[in-house]
Design a protein with these regions (language model features):
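Hydrophobic core
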Residues: 15-21
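Mature, structured domains of secreted/extracytosolic soluble proteins
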Residues: 5-10, 22-219
Length: 219
């Protein structure tokens, strides 16, 4: 696997550029505030490896790594800088398994998703396509927590970092059932997994796990 920490550092540097730090005032002893946690750090928390858990985010992690390795200046690098406020809707490994099956007719495993084969199929789509799909899952600006998403009017649009819109659909607010409309009207709408609400809450970057991949065009 690629060295994640090196790629994260490269992506953050590309995003931030050169930063000049002012010298502290003599005698000042104020403790430094901890740096906010980025979603890149959260994605790395369970390791940079494929595994047998189809409901975590290994394929997404590898997709981010692949884009940053080939395109360090990509807007995807925002995920490595915890100070950039954003909301990401992150598909789990099963979601990518479904996408690859829909696109190719080939389903790699079932009860045990063959994550590396699924990722290789995703990678075969090309860097620019992967980048476009990733950015379609990111909304820049103040983080949108689950309570906020659950409370908006049905059909509220959100403009993504890719430039296209997704639509928030609170289906049954008392139970926080929230779907997301994308640009593929012929397939199931992704929905937010209730157990994966508000990942990294309390930081400028927040994520919600989703059960299908958002599609920026009609497949």
């Amino acid at each position: 696997m690629r060295t994640w920490k090196k790629l994260v550092a490269t992506g953050a540097a590309a995003l931030l550029g050169t930063v000049t730090v002012a010298a502290p005032v003599a005698g000042a002893q104020e403790p430094e505030a901890p740096a906010p946690t980025s979603l890149a750090e959260v994605l790395l928390a369970d390791g940079d490896e494929f595994d047998r858990n189809a409901y975590d985010f290994d394929i997404l992690t590898q997709a981010v790594l692949t884009v940053l390795a080939e395109k360090p200046d990509s807007p995807v690098a925002a995920l490595t800088d915890g100070s950039v406020p954003l909301t990401a809707f992150i598909p789990n490994d099963r979601a990518f398994w479904t996408l690859v099956g829909d696109l190719t007719g080939q389903y790699y495993g079932f009860f045990k998703v063959q994550e590396e084969k699924v990722f290789n199929a995703v990678a075969s789509l090309g860097i620019d396509t992967i980048e476009t799909v990733l950015l379609y899952h990111v909304v820049l600006g103040d983080p949108i927590d689950s309570d906020t998403a659950n409370g908006v009017p049905f059909g509220t649009p959100l403009t993504t970092a890719q430039g296209g819109d997704i639509v928030v659909k609170p289906i049954f607010p008392p139970f926080k059932w929230i779907a997301l409309g994308d640009n593929d009207p012929n397939d199931f709408d992704p929905f937010i997994i209730p157990s994966k609400f508000d990942i990294n809450k309390g930081n400028p970057q927040i994520a919600h796990g989703i059960a299908f991949v958002l599609r920026p065009l009609d497949l």
